[in-house]
Amino acid sequence: MMNDKKAQTRERILQAASAALIQRGPAEPSVGEVMGAAGLTVGGFYAHFESKDALMLEAFTQLLARRRASIDDMDAQLTGEERRGLVAAFYLSRKHRDSTAQACPIPATVGEMARLPDAFRDALSEHVELMAAQLAASPEDTDKALADMALMIGGLALARALGPGELSDRVLRAAKSAVR
C-alpha cells in the first residue's frame, strides 16, 4: 500500500516537472514550484529524487520516450516518408504549439543543452538516433529524417517563441510543407 502511494506521488511530481520543463525549460523551475504544482510540500522531495537535475532528467527522458512510443503506435505499413508526414502534421500544428500537457520537450531545452548536465545531452542524442531510425524509410534515408526532425524542432521552437498569431501560423505551415 505504501509503495503504491509513493509511486503515485512520484508520478505527480514527474507530471508537474514535465509541464514546467516544457513551459520554462529544465533549469528555471525551482523544486518548490514543481512540488507546489504537484500539490505537495518541498519537504517530501528528497524521498523521491536525489536532486532537481535528477527529477528534470527523468521528466525529460519520459517525455522523449512518449514521443517515440506515439510513432511506434503508427501503422507498420506506413513508409518512413508517410510517418514523417503524419508526425509533421501533428508536430507542426497549432494544438501542439499551444499545448504544454504532452508536448515535445526538445524545443524548450535545446537552447540550454550546453549548460545542462551531460546526461541531458546523452538522452537527447539517444532519442535523436532512435527517432531518425523510426522516421527513415530505409537506413540510407536517415540523414533526410534527421534534416526533417531539425526542421520540425526549429519550426516549432520559432512558432512557440512568436506566440499564437499569423506569423507563428505561417512558420508552422512553411515548416510543414518543407518536410517531405
Predicted regions and their residues:
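N-terminal intrinsically disordered/low-complexity leader segments
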Residues: 1-7
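Helix-turn-helix
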Residues: 12, 20-54, 58
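Amphipathic alpha-helical interaction segments
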Residues: 12, 82, 86, 90, ...
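Hydrophobic alpha-helical connector segments
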Residues: 58, 72-102
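Amphipathic alpha-helical packing segments from all-alpha helical-bundle domains
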Residues: 65-68, 85, 101-103, 113-140, ...
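Helix-loop "lid/cap" segments that line or gate small-molecule binding pockets
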Residues: 92-96, 106-115
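Hydrophobic/aromatic-rich alpha-helical bundle segments in the mid-to-C-terminal region
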Residues: 117-125, 137-180
